[in-house]
Amino acid sequence: MAAPEDVAALQAEITRREEELASLKRRLAAALTAEPEPERPLRVPPPPLAPRAALSRDEILRYSRQLLLPELGVRGQLRLAAAAVLVVGCGGLGCPLAQYLAAAGVGRLGLVDHDVVETSNLARQVLHGEAQAGESKARSAAAALRRLNSAVECVAYPRALAEDWALDLVRGYDVVADCCDNVPTRYLVNDACVLAGRPLVSASALRFEGQMTVYHHDGGPCYRCVFPRPPPPETVTNCADGGVLGAVPGVLGCAQALEVLKIAAGLGSSYSGSMLLFDGLGGHFRRIRLRRRRPDCVVCGQQPTVTRLQDYEAFCGSSATDKCRALKLLCPEERISVTDYKRLLDSGAPHVLLDVRPQVEVDICRLPHSLHIPLSQLERRDADSLKLLGAALRKGKQESQEGVALPVYVICKLGNDSQKAVKVLQSLTAVPELDSLTVQDIVGGLMAWAAKIDGTFPQY
C-alpha cells in the first residue's frame, strides 16, 4: 500500500493537472468565440513557414498511421508541416479537400471564397452547419478546420479572387487547389499558377459526374493547353441549374486532397498529364490521358503572350460566380412582375399559366392552377404538347364570359427559360389559338414568387 505522502502528492498533481486542463479549455473557448483577426493585406504574400527538424510527441501520436507508410514517413510529414496550400472555393469540393488536408497536418491553408453559407449548401458543403447560415464561407471553413486541428494555420480570404491580387497571393503558397464553380476563375487560377510556378490541382463536379487532374506540374499541360478557348457561356451548366448529389463532389474533393498531399510531401503526382473521370451513377472510375503541353500555349508555351493576369470575365464572356445570370430576351411589354400577376390572379381574370420547368422540378413544387409543358417539348414542337396547350386555350375561351382568347403567362424557376418559351410560342404556327394572343413571361419566376408573394412556397 502506498505511503500517505505519496497519495497526497498524487492527489495534488491531479488537482494541478485538472486546473491546467480547465485553463486550456477556457482559452480554447475564448479563441473559438473571439472576433476574427483583421484580414492581412492581400497584396502581401504570407511569410513562408519555417522548416521543421523533428516531430513532437503529440504529432507522432496524431499522425502515427500515416507515419507508418514508407513512402511518407517522418520526412514526408515534416514536408507537410512546412507546406502551404491555397484552396480556391470553400464549397462542395473545397470542404472535403480542406478537411483532409487539415487532418493530415498541412502547415497552412489559405481559404478563398467570396460567398456566404446558404441552407442549400449544407447537403454537400460539409464544413458548414446550420448555425453558419449567412456567414462567410471562408471564415466558416477556417473556424471548422481550427476545431479539427488547432496546429494548422488557417487564413481566410472572404472575397472573390481577382486579377489585381491573385498572383501575389498564389506566390505565397506551394500548391493551389482549384475548387471553384465558374469558368473565369479557372482561367485566372491557371494563369496565376503558371506565372508563379505553382502546381494546380483542379476538379469539378455536376449531377452524378466529376473529373480531377493536375495542371502545370512535372512537365504536364496547363489548363489553357487543354482548353485554349472558354466555352460559350450559354453551354455552361452549374449546380444551381443542373443539380449535384453531395457525395460526388465529396469523392472528387478527396481525390484532390490525395494529389495535393502527394505533391506537398514530395511523392509526385499520379495525374499530371492525365485526368480522372468519375461516374457516380454507374459507379465507374476512368483515367484518360490529356494532350501534352502545347509549345504554342499562350501562357506556358515557348513564346507566351499572357505575361500578366487579365480581365477574365471579359475573356470568358461570363461572370466569376455560379449565380444564374438573368437573361433579357424580351422587351418590357412582354413581361409581367410577380406582383402584377398576383393582382391578376386575385381578380379572377381568366388566363392560362404555363409552367415550362422540367418534370423533376415540377415534382418539387408547383402552383396548383398551372399547366405543365417543359420547355424542351416546346422547342422541339412536340405534337402532343401543342395539342394539350391548344385544348387548354379552347376550353378557357369557351368558359370565358366574353368568349375572347385567354392570355398566356409563362413561368419557370428564375425567369430565364420562361423568356425562351415566350419566343417559341410567338413563332408557333401549328397552334391556331396562339394567333394574336398575349403571351408574357413572369419576371423572376417561382423563386421571385416565393420571395415576394408567398413566403411558404418552397425555394430550391
Curated annotation (Swiss-Prot):
The modification Cysteine persulfide is found at residue 412. CDD domains: RHOD_ThiF (cd01526), ThiF_MoeB_HesA_family (cd00757). InterPro entries: MOCS3/Uba4, Rhodanese-like_dom, Rhodanese-like_dom_sf, ThiF/MoeB/HesA, ThiF_NAD_FAD-bd, Ubiquitin-activating_enz. SMART domains: RHOD. GO terms for molecular function: ATP binding; metal ion binding; molybdopterin-synthase adenylyltransferase activity; molybdopterin-synthase sulfurtransferase activity; nucleotidyltransferase activity; sulfurtransferase activity; URM1 activating enzyme activity. Zn(2+) binds at residues 222, 225, 297, 300. The keyword Disulfide bond applies. The active site is at residues 239, 412. One of its GO terms (cellular component) is cytosol. GO terms for biological process: Mo-molybdopterin cofactor biosynthetic process; molybdopterin cofactor biosynthetic process; tRNA thio-modification; tRNA wobble position uridine thiolation; tRNA wobble uridine modification. It comes from the Eukaryota. HAMAP family: MOCS3_Uba4. Its main location: cytoplasm. Residues 347-458 form the Rhodanese domain. Its cofactor is Zn(2+). Disulfide bonds join 316-324. PROSITE patterns: RHODANESE_3. Pfam families: Rhodanese (PF00581), ThiF (PF00899). Keywords: ATP-binding, Cytoplasm, Disulfide bond, Metal-binding, Molybdenum cofactor biosynthesis, Multifunctional enzyme, Nucleotide-binding, Nucleotidyltransferase, Transferase, tRNA processing, Zinc. It catalyses: [molybdopterin-synthase sulfur-carrier protein]-C-terminal Gly-Gly + ATP + H(+) = [molybdopterin-synthase sulfur-carrier protein]-C-terminal Gly-Gly-AMP + diphosphate; [molybdopterin-synthase sulfur-carrier protein]-C-terminal Gly-Gly-AMP + S-sulfanyl-L-cysteinyl-[cysteine desulfurase] + AH2 = [molybdopterin-synthase sulfur-carrier protein]-C-terminal-Gly-aminoethanethioate + L-cysteinyl-[cysteine desulfurase] + A + AMP + 2 H(+). ATP binds at residues 92, 113, 120-124, 137, 181-182. It comes from Mus musculus (Mouse). Gene3D superfamilies: NAD(P)-binding Rossmann-like Domain, Rhodanese-like domain. In the N-terminal section; belongs to the HesA/MoeB/ThiF family. UBA4 subfamily. This is Adenylyltransferase and sulfurtransferase MOCS3.
